[in-house]
């Protein structure tokens, strides 16, 4: 059986990518280096996404290439933070399904960041997932908080038909995604530390932060999507739990 080039190209993005960070604008994508911490070995971008200070939150849009994925959203403050992704914006949870997925309101207020946010402050967002079959996959976006930026939802913040999110609880939520399976269990051979070379030092503080953030800001950092109906879950205190 022969398939047309157009047919094959339609499936190429999902086949080629473990996941893609669509928004904020990512540093790029390289499937060969995506397993390297931090940021899939991609250099810092000079084109920082402007994030409205007054909004108190911003969307994180992804394109998923695996039907079950553990995902975590981290942040590092500063112009060039290196491996210091010690702020948990969203603890580890599971995404089920392929294609577009969006968290429309990822909170970044002072209680989450642990410091006062000022106009012009730079930061780097890192979305990390469980690896295939082990370790982690990493994608980063460089951002700048701004008092003049508009609070607008990007067109990429959408959810594909059939995609859903499931909140982890307890140890599964506290475990870094690069140490987790898609089911929220510890990866084989991982005893609380990352199985990725060089990533443990960068995530030791993130693990501690995740533990406190998951409990103290679960209501504020809600597991929500642009279309609430796709969760198929009971919403308790703003956090969807199955």
Curated annotation (Swiss-Prot):
Residues 180-214 have a biased composition (Low complexity). This is Uncharacterized protein AFUA_6G02800. Keywords: Cell membrane, Glycoprotein, GPI-anchor, Lipoprotein, Membrane, Signal, Transferase. InterPro entries: BIM1-like, BIM1-like_dom. A lipid is attached at residue 218 (GPI-like-anchor amidated alanine). It is found in: Cell membrane. It comes from the Eukaryota. Residues 1-17 form the signal peptide. GO terms for molecular function: transferase activity. Residues 219-242 form a propeptide. The lineage of its organism: Eukaryota, Fungi, Dikarya, Ascomycota, Pezizomycotina. Its main location: membrane. Pfam families: BIM1-like_dom. The GPI-like anchor contains a phosphoceramide lipid group. The anchor position has not been determined. Glycans are attached at residues 47, 86, 122, 159, 178. The keyword Endoplasmic reticulum does not apply. One of its GO terms (cellular component) is side of membrane. Residues 176-214 are annotated as: Disordered.
């Amino acid at each position: 059986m022969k398939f047309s080039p157009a047919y094959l190209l339609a499936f190429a993005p999902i086949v080629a990518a473990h996941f893609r960070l669509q928004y904020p604008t990512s540093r790029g994508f390289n499937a060969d280096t995506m397993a390297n911490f931090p940021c899939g070995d991609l250099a810092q971008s000079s084109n920082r996404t402007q994030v409205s200070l007054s909004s108190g939150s911003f969307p994180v849009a992804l394109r998923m290439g695996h039907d079950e994925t553990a995902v975590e959203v981290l942040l590092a403050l500063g112009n060039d933070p290196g491996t210091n992704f010690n702020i948990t914006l969203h603890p580890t949870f599971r995404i089920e399904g392929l294609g577009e997925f969006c968290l429309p309101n990822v909170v970044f207020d002072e209680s989450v960041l642990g410091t006062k946010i000022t106009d012009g402050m730079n930061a780097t967002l890192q979305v990390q997932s469980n690896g295939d079959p082990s370790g982690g996959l990493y994608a980063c976006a460089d951002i700048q908080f701004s008092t003049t930026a508009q609070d607008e939802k990007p067109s990429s913040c959408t959810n594909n038909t059939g995609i859903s999110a499931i909140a982890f609880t307890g140890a599964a939520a506290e475990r870094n995604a690069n140490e987790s399976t898609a089911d929220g269990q510890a990866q084989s051979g991982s005893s609380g530390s990352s199985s990725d070379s060089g990533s443990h030092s960068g995530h030791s503080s993130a693990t501690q932060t995740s533990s406190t953030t998951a409990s103290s800001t679960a209501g504020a950092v809600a597991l929500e999507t642009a279309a609430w109906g796709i969760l198929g879950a009971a919403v308790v205190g703003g956090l969807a739990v199955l």
